[in-house]
UniProtKB/Swiss-Prot annotation:
Disrupted-gene phenotype: Mpl-deletion mice produce residual numbers of platelets that are sufficient to prevent bleeding and allow normal survival.
Pfam families: EpoR_lig-bind (PF09067)
Transmembrane segments: 483-504
CDD domains assigned: FN3 (cd00063)
Subunit structure of this chain's protein: Homodimer. Interacts with ATXN2L. Interacts with JAK2 and TYK2; these interactions increase MPL localization to the cell membrane. Interacts with THPO. Interacts with SHIP/INPP5D. Interacts with kinases BTK and SYK.
Signal peptide boundaries: 1-25
Segments in the Cytoplasmic topological domain: 505-625
Keywords recorded for this protein, A-Z: Cell membrane, Glycoprotein, Golgi apparatus, Isopeptide bond, Membrane, Phosphoprotein, Receptor, Repeat, Signal, Transmembrane, Transmembrane helix, Ubl conjugation
Inducing stimuli: Expression in the bone marrow displays diurnal rhythmicity (a circadian rhythm that is synchronized with the day/night cycle).
Motif (WSXWS motif): 465-469
Domain observations: The WSXWS motif appears to be necessary for proper protein folding and thereby efficient intracellular transport and cell-surface receptor binding.
Record protein name field: Thrombopoietin receptor
Motif stretch (Box 1 motif): 519-527
High-level lineage: Eukaryota, Metazoa, Chordata, Craniata, Vertebrata
Organism for this UniProt entry: Mus musculus (Mouse)
Length: 625
């Protein structure tokens, strides 16, 4: 039999037998049988169902279930039987609706065999401790305000006890490739769950007050709600752009009411929108009025942007959000298709802005991308700052930048990046918040490119980074610091030495003269040095004995030439001392009695020191004409 046919038959049976509660095998499993022969549970804590199993079927009217509160007369609960293949026959009793089910009072139960007039089972229980809540119904799931968030809404089957229940979520990806992956079970805490209020006159979403929890009636009028209809929870940490299935179940909180976990609800599937970061979504404002959003345009696709405003509240609304179309910027006629799509809209500063982008492929498939919500003062885009620099020393730059938005100067932070010529890696520096300049140390005799950008990051305004400024080309000079230092040091030392010498000359002349003689000695007498040199050379001449022997080798002449008359003109005297012009004269010749010069020709003669005048010459030289 098909599943839909089985569902229709079961529904007809339930409609035909409205007073007969069905005890399913799942209910039996959840009650953890084996501790009590008579099992009872309550789904809304306003009803009660009890059952027990017998191995053999008995005729109708054989068994009877009696119940009574303390001090009251026992009453019989109508029984009906179910065939259980494993245990035989199951007898089930659902308390009549007209009989009030009381909480926090002991309830006495008896199972009797009427034919034998024998009590088979006896039990005392509290209805508030045998809870088995039915699963939530009318479950709605959709993406939250953040990428990867799941917002769940449901209606409680028993509104009166919804505040005393806790819920558990079971979910997993619907992708068939991950079918074997274990499902995730998460206990939904009260911090992420809020009750959904049912109000007689719903107000617009933006005018709804913050989440109101159920309270007693106010003395000045009725409460702004009637009953708690259901709940709402926000689950985060999911993967954006994926499809998930989910189930919910409930359990008493264990404080006011106690019991077991109820059955799981039917699975509900939901498709989460993708993260708009993957398409490069960026929204900004220049005047705090108009908001511009841009994203990357893919090939052979069309896209459209949507926006909505919402108020922050602790409980999300169960209504589907209303998205407004963002006004798209049309490309210029004749221009090539833009790689970036843009749209703009007028915003307010008193609500949160949500952005949704729908991309339609060439095959007609629609993919949704959700951006992170933001306030308009968190998306202020600054113009590109201008960078000025000057080199104060070799490799040391003094930087200054100016910005047009002086009203937000103290909340503006900057990023400076630079790189060497021919390199692709950038070094990024972040000056302190609100800085208007700084210094940068670079390598001398090199070329660099510098760029600057800015953004707001203060307590009042925030925003994205601006575009990088045009590259500033910098050529650093040679490193002359050490030359300047050495020159200055030499000048200081020279001046100090000069001042010291002047002071020494004035105060201590004797010491000054000695110091001057030691530092600047007087030039020697060249004549004295030459004479000393000649004397030293003569001392190193051959010994006297050797010269005497050589003189003895010269034999004297036996002829003496005398003049004719003794009245001849006297010759000038020769100097008694030999001249130093002929240092090569033999020492033996210095003692010879050569006192007059020989007669000269008629033209006259003079005394000469030529060595030929002191030697014996051939006779023909002295003959008269």
């Amino acid at each position: 039999m098909p599943s839909w046919a089985l569902f229709m038959v079961t529904s007809c049976l339930l409609l035909a037998l409205p007073n007969q509660a069905q005890v399913t095998s799942q209910d039996v499993f959840l009650l953890a049988l084996g501790t009590e022969p008579l099992n009872c549970f309550s789904q809304t804590f306003e009803d009660l169902t009890c059952f027990w199993d017998e191995e053999e079927a008995a005729p109708s009217g054989t068994y009877q279930l009696l119940y009574a509160y303390r001090g009251e007369k026992p009453r019989a609960c109508p029984l009906y039987s179910q065939s259980v293949p494993t245990f035989g026959t199951r007898y089930v009793c659902q308390f009549p609706a007209q009989d009030e089910v009381r909480l926090f009072f002991p309830l006495h139960l008896w199972v009797k065999n009427v034919s034998l007039n024998q009590t088979l089972i006896q039990r005392v229980l509290f209805v508030d401790s045998v809870g088995l809540p039915a699963p939530p119904r009318v479950i709605k799931a959709r993406g939250g305000s953040q990428p990867g968030e799941l917002q769940i809404h449901w209606e409680a089957p028993a509104p009166e006890i919804s505040d005393f229940l806790r819920h558990e979520l079971r979910y997993g990806p619907t992708d068939s490739s991950n079918a074997t992956a274990p499902s995730v079970i998460q206990l939904l805490s009260t911090e992420t769950c809020c009750p959904t209020l049912w109000m007689p006159n719903p107000v617009p979403v933006l005018d709804q007050p913050p989440c109101v929890h159920p309270t007693a009636s106010q003395p000045h009028g009725p409460a702004p709600f009637l009953t708690v209809k259901g709940g709402s929870c926000l689950v985060s940490g999911l993967q954006a752009g994926k499809s998930y299935w989910l189930q919910l179940r409930s359990q008493p909180d264990g404080v006011s009411l106690r019991g077991s976990w109820g059955p799981w609800s039917f699975p509900v599937t939901v498709d989460l929108p993708g993260d708009a970061v993957t398409i490069g979504l960026q929204c900004f404002t220049l005047d705090l009025k108009m908001v511009t959003c841009q994203w990357q345009q893919q090939d052979r696709t069309s896209s459209q942007g949507f926006f909505r405003h919402s108020r922050t509240r602790c409980c999300p609304t169960d209504r589907d959000p209303t998205w407004e179309k963002c006004e798209e910027e049309e490309p210029r006629p004749g221009s090539q298709p833009a790689l970036v799509s843009r749209c703009h809209f007028k915003s307010r500063n008193d609500s949160v802005i949500h952005i949704l982008v729908e991309v339609t492929t060439a095959q007609g498939a629609v993919h949704s991308y959700l951006g992170s919500p933001f306030w308009i003062h968190q998306a202020v885009l600054l113009p590109t700052p201008s960078l000025h620099w000057r080199e104060v020393s070799s490799g040391r730059l003094e930087l200054e930048w100016q910005h047009q938005s002086s009203w937000a100067a103290q909340e503006t932070c900057y990023q400076l990046r630079y790189t060497g010529e021919g390199r692709e890696d950038w070094k990024v520096l972040e000056p302190s918040l609100g800085a208007r300049g700084g210094t940068l140390e670079l390598r001398p005799r090199a070329r660099y490119s510098l760029q600057l950008r800015a953004r707001l990051n203060g307590p009042t305004y925030q925003g994205p980074w601006s575009a990088w400024s045009p590259p500033a080309r910098v050529s650093t000079g040679s490193e002359t610091a050490w030359i300047t230092l050495v020159t200055a040091l030499l000048l200081v030392l020279s001046l100090s030495a000069l001042l010291g010498l002047l002071l020494l000359k004035w105060q201590f002349p004797a010491h000054y003269r000695r110091l001057r003689h030691a530092l600047w000695p007087s030039l020697p007498d060249l004549h004295r040095v030459l004479g000393q040199y000649l004397r030293d050379t003569a001392a190193l001449s051959p010994s006297k004995a050797t010269v005497t022997d050589s003189c003895e080798e010269v034999e004297p002449s036996l002829l003496e030439i005398l003049p004719k008359s003794s009245e001849s003109t006297p010759l000038p005297l020769c100097p008694s001392q030999p001249q130093m012009d002929y240092r090569g004269l033999q020492p033996c010749l210095r003692t010879m009695p050569l006192s007059v010069c020989p007669p000269m020709a008629e033209t006259g003669s003079c005394c000469t020191t030529h060595i030929a005048n002191h030697s014996y010459l051939p006779l023909s030289y002295w003959q008269q004409p």
